[in-house]
Amino acid sequence: MNNNSKRKTRPTGGGASGGISRYNSNDNSLRPTNNKAGAGGGNGGAAVRPSAQGVYNNTFFMHSATALVGSVVEVRLRSGNIYEGVFRTFSGNFDIALELPACIKSKNLPEEGKVPKHIIFPADTVVTIVAKDFDSQYATAGAFQTDGAISDKCNGARPDEKELEPWDSGANGDIDIELDSAANGWDPNEMFRKNENTFGVTSTFDDSLASYTVPLDKGDSLEFKEAEAKAEKLAAEIENNPTCRDRLDLENGDEEALFAAVERPSTEQDQRGDRGDRERNDRDREREERDRDRDRDRGNKPRGAGDFQLRETMSSDRYITKQTRSITGPQLSHVGMSSQGSGRDRDTRGDGSMMMQSGGGSGQGGSTQSTAALMLAGGLKGVGPAPSANASADSSSKYSGGSMVKRKTVPQGGKVMRNNVPTGGSNVSVSQGGNGNSVGQNKGGYQPSMGMPSQYSYQGNSQIMHGSSQYRNQSHMGGANKLNGDSNANTNKPLPQRQMRQYQGSQSNSSLNYGGEPQSLGKPVHGSHGGHPGQNSNSPPLQTAGPQQQQQQQQQQQQQQQQQQPPQQQQHQNIQPQGQNTQPARQVRTRDNQMQELRQFGQDFQLAPSNTSPPQQQQQQQQQQQQHQVQQQQQRALQQSASPPQQQQQQQQQQQHVVLHQVPQTHLHQAALSQPHYVPQQQPQQAPLPQQQHVPHHMQQKAQQQQLVETQHQHVQKQHQSQPQVQQPPPQLLQDPSQQPLPIYHTMPPPQTSPVVVTSPVLLEQPPPQPMPVVQQQQTQQLATPKPEVSPAPPSSNTTTPTGIASTPTAGVIASAGSEKTTPAAPTPTSNSATVPTGTAATAGGATGTTPVVKKHVLNPSAKPFTPRGPSTPNPSRPHTPQTPVPMTNIYTTTGGHVPPAANQPIYVMQPQHPFPPQTHPQAGQPPRLRRSNYPPMAASQMHVSASAATGQPLITAGPIPQFIQYGHAPHQQQFQSHTYAPMQMRVYPDQPQQLQFMTQTPQSTTPSPGQPHQQFHPPPQPSPAGGGPQPAFTPPTQAATYQLMCVHPQSLLANHYFPPPTPQHPQQNQQQYQIVMQQHQPQ
């Protein structure tokens, strides 16, 4: 009743009491506000927005009311009737409109039957409004989640996946997809008819498309049937091919399943994961296989000689790097230097070939060598792997893997690395000299300074290797030697000289010839040619003769397998390139010529067996330079036709190498050279003589290369006889140069007849070590310095000066090649018949061919201990083992492997005659020099020690390498001219010649202390009295030639206690010597 009374009193009552009360209060409140708003509007103006009327002005009420719109509601009226309908809307007074209202409870039955569409109930008649089945959360919570809710309900929410069915075109009825019928509603033929009839256009369309294709002439002829049968047969074969079948299956199979099918995400992910796992597993397996192969290759590399070339290309970098590490890090520095050289080589040479060769060289040399080999470039590959370099590089790679290879290569290859670049052109010095060499070489005077520093760093690396010393000599030859050559060339005609080197690039030997540089001093052309083909014959072929060098390289590698004979063959090969190169050498240098000079220079550096005492070399160089000057004119006339003669001589030398007698002149000269190197291991002084001999010989080579092709052999013998210490080898060298004797020098490297070579004066002075000369000789040949070590024993090897060594090497090379360890017995013959070898160059070739066995056996006793070393340091052991002639001969075997270095070293000796004598002084009694000859087997330091101890000779091959490694640039300086020759850079410029010289001295040092190569290198000052005594005589002449180019550095080199007298004479050579010494020490 209370409620009713209240409703009656309220005109607007009709809803629920609560709603009405709110409505009333709101309405009342609205009215005053409206009034106020109106008054304010009247007073303030019409800007005031009119407010909503009635309930529309109540925001909260409107929110609740509108939420009910569209819902089914029951409206109770004051009359007691209840209507149910859809709440449609309401007015400002809250008059309610219902759709399809139905009277649930009515007093008037007749009305109940009527259902109007809309009924509006005034607000005052409504008592309550109740909404049924109303979701109070729908409007607020579910709206923005509609999509997500639908997705959750429909997509992927089903626990069971619907089975997928493939699409079947027949399911929807056959679909005609043919174009022939009027599927699209019109007939193409009708179109043609209409165009023809209406427009007069006739179509040439033919269903057979005969105008677009070539119809087959299917006749009944027999030919057509045969062709058809043949075609069907071929088609059947192709279709039956498993590969073809797989493709057809892929094309004709269920492409939808492969490319267009819908796959469950989980299944696809699983498959992808499985595929990823399989792929990862496959990659892991492949990586493991590659690693195993690499390890297997590394393991085989030290032992493989025949596959050395392949391995060097395939895995030389990997293996060599590893081996380089084993070598104790000098190789690494060597590599760094080498890479510098290679970079400079690129800059100076701008020749892809040099870099390519460098790469090849690195392959052989090893990873370190690869950089170094880059500098060697062609030198190591073409020349570096020359009998010495090849034997050394190959053997080293065989024995010590990369490390040994690096060292051995360094003697030939290492030097070659530098020399190669200089050989290609003066610029090649860069690769040799490292940074500045190529630049320095490009500029005659500047080259020395640049060459020295670059070589300094390079020397440091080279020193690390036994061959490093030799390498340094080569580097000096490339830079300093080039400088020496430039000294000669610069003094005389630096550019021509480089040209000479370019063409003599294969005769880069001039660099190898330490004496060769002095010769270059005497005659720039000859000096550049002075990279004695004979001496450099180990590596030179690589530089100048790109193809020939490669061929020679291959031959060298093959010969390396043959070890000692191969060096000779390589020498012959090298001689050929040099002969070819020698001719152009005289021509004005072009960029190509410079590049060739660089390559040749690298080769010459390889040849730089500076074993002959530098003084002897200088003397011989001076003598030979004079001769060469006379001969150069002849050669210049002959050089045009020089390559044929040189090639002939090369062939002869090769024949000598094979026959040893065919080219006894050239080959024996090489043998003599190689013997001096070889003997120098036995006798430090002897090695220097060969170097001097080589240097003059190199000059002679340039002057007389072609004339001397025949005459030089005699001349060499004569020189050897006249210049027992150095000159006889120089004639040989000259012959080699004229004949392109680099190969000859390679022939020398197999100094199987090395003992015969002992005839050089230095060798005479140092007869005692001769028993080991064969092995050492090869080593010394590879390592110019080791030869001088033999010097102490040369008294018996007096007979043949470095020339004697060279002459014996022909036989010696073969003998060595045949039996590298034969040297022990051969040394005595060498010293005794050393003189004979020079004269007996031919006989030495043939006789030593037979002799090597005896010498080999003599050396074998001591060498065998080295063979055991193979495991620890494969390269060193092999060089010492006489019975591992082929691989070890070139790389490890002091006899065979080092013989090629000896050949190279004699050339070195020639140029750095002054440096070598000083080296000889420090190394006079030290086998470390010989070890330097062994530097190719860088890891064979222990082997060198044991081999030298057992053999009684300096272990050139094994010892020198470690010595050089251990010795930093500074130690090498000490050994060479003075340990205080701190400025490696200075040495670097005269580096190449001096390195060659140093190589000779290093063998001398090695000879005194065969047991320990490192000690041997350090003792070089001690042997200086013993080996220095003989060498000083040669020192003045050689230094005079050497220092010309390296005036500044030479003095410091001269300042060294090793070569005080040489300094004034040939500062360049002394510098070179210092460089060589540094290299030697580093290798230690």
UniProtKB/Swiss-Prot annotation:
Superkingdom, taxonomy of origin: Eukaryota
Residue stretches of biased makeup (Basic residues): 1-10
Biased composition (Pro residues): 871-885
Domain Sm span(s) in chain numbering: 60-135
Localization per Swiss-Prot or TrEMBL: Cytoplasm
Keyword flag Cytoplasm: yes
Gene Ontology CC terms, in alphabetical order: cytoplasm; cytoplasmic stress granule; ribonucleoprotein granule
Start-end of Polar residues biased regions: 22-33, 312-331, 452-476, 484-513, 886-896
Compositional bias segments (type: Basic and acidic residues): 265-300
Phenotype caused by lack of the gene: Second instar larvae lethal.
Keywords: Cytoplasm, Developmental protein, Phosphoprotein
Low complexity bias locations: 384-403, 424-445, 540-584, 613-694, 701-711, 733-743, 754-765, 773-788, 796-812, 822-853, 1000-1017, 1066-1084
Residue ranges of the region described as Disordered: 1-46, 260-935, 1000-1037, 1057-1084
Classification via PROSITE patterns: SM
GO biological process terms held by the UniProt record: chaeta development; circadian regulation of translation; compound eye development; compound eye photoreceptor development; habituation; locomotor rhythm; long-term memory; miRNA-mediated post-transcriptional gene silencing
Family that this chain belongs to: Belongs to the ataxin-2 family.
Domain notes: The PAM2 motif, and therefore interaction with pAbp, is essential for binding to the 5' cap of pre-mRNAs.
Subunit structure: Homodimer. In the circadian pacemaker neurons, core component of the Atx2-tyf activator complex composed of at least Atx2, tyf, pAbp, Lsm12a. In the circadian pacemaker neurons, also a core component of the Atx2-Not1 repressor complex composed of at least Atx2, tyf, pAbp, me31B. Interacts (via PAM2 motif) with pAbp. Interacts (via N-terminus) with tyf independently of pAbp. Forms a subcomplex composed of Atx2 and pAbP which can associate with the 5' cap of pre-mRNAs independently of tyf, Lsm12a or me31B. Interacts with Lsm12a and me31B.
Designated name of the protein: Ataxin-2 homolog
Gene: Atx2
